[in-house]
Amino acid sequence: MSHNNVTHGKPWSGRFHEPTDTFVEEFTASIGFDHRLYRQDIHGSIAHARMLAKVGVLSREECDAIIQGLETIAQDISRGQFSWSVALEDVHMNIEAALTERIGPVGKKLHTGRSRNDQIATDIRLYLRDAIDLITAQLQRLQEGLLAIAEREAATIMPGFTHLQTAQPVTFGHHLMAWFEMLLRDTGRLADCRHRVNVLPLGAAALAGTTFPIDRAYTAELLGFDGIAENSLDAVSDRDFAIEFTAAGALLMTHLSRFAEELVLWSSAQFDFITLPDRFCTGSSIMPQKKNPDVPELVRGKTGRVNGHLVSLLTLMKGQPLAYNKDNQEDKEPLFDTVDTLLGCLRAFADMIPAITTNPDKMREAATKGYATATDLADYLVRKGVSFRDAHEIVGKAVALAIEQSKDLAALKLATLQDFSPVIEEDVFDVLTLEGSVAARNHLGGTAPAQVRAAIQRGREKLNSLA
């Protein structure tokens, strides 16, 4: 019986006696999507080669040849001059095969002390680290746009809503600053996630570490990692960092989706609070008059993609024993699409928001409807010595009468108001104006224009501290 090695063209096929089924080869290959990790893969391989040379596993000449070969491969890929092979399965094997073809047998030494298990974990962490930085930059650009509009509209009065019903007057600047605060927390979540992403798995090898005298601290330094994974099994087994990122992305997209919903409402003829620039809208194939808010609608719709990716990754991991399993090949497409979706939606919003024009007269007119100053009247009664519950009852009856007469509270005569409570005096009309209502909420977090401007200043300081 012959014991000749039957390679079948695979780097792992020494123990196999027949080639991989053609369909299985295509079914199990990931090169169709993980090729986008080539920069990170080559960056990690160069650092690994330098570390191997430092500890004496590679000679300086071998290390230089490997690095030069990898750099030329990176150039070819970036120029579209590299052919990816399904037969070589993934980005790692494609690059390694090309390296060996170009520099000879020394290319086969690169994988010493390393497995694809810790290699892909390193690639993904490098990719996510870069992605978080790009996303954060777009997010901060959007926040800067919000601050600019909020400052311009710090005193623009609009109705505040609960249950989408008029509740109390607020300023448009105050409303926009609510979105700023939500996005600021999203920025913090991404920064916090980045700390846990920025941990080096390389050196864990397949699952148990390696017998070679590797210097993981040196590799971490070369790759800019803040920490080193301290358990080899954990390093290659978990994708919690990817799940955490996707969860942060889902929250961010949820905030964008809610904001998008308001933009759609506000830009409608029924609200007419804002006008979206034509360049961010589309028309109808049949209705000539239409100007559709497609950008915010798409952002709202794309939120479901990221939410779905979060569930996919959670489900992917929930039943896996330690250590690495082929299931984890399915982590990349949800992750890549989450990054692409976040970057696209944030860019669209960051470009669109500063270009929005407001219709202050329409906002103010809407705030005059729905008895938005009713709470101010109740507060007025409390300051006159009436308990809040009694004041609530009194004002409710006054509102009912105003509805009957199709009048605003401020349009009721003083004598009519005094019929509801004798403590009401002429000064009541000061609190029933929209401007008076807004100005009265002059405390930290309130909607008074002075407080809005102070919040904007604090917001700028927070953004500057993140730069």
UniProtKB/Swiss-Prot annotation:
This is Argininosuccinate lyase. Transmembrane segments: none annotated. The keyword Cytoplasm applies. Gene3D superfamilies: Fumarase/aspartase (C-terminal domain), Fumarase/aspartase (Central domain), Fumarase/aspartase (N-terminal domain). The gene is argH. Belongs to the lyase 1 family. Argininosuccinate lyase subfamily. Pathway: Amino-acid biosynthesis; L-arginine biosynthesis; L-arginine from L-ornithine and carbamoyl phosphate: step 3/3. Keywords: Amino-acid biosynthesis, Arginine biosynthesis, Cytoplasm, Lyase. CDD domains: Argininosuccinate_lyase. It is found in: Cytoplasm.
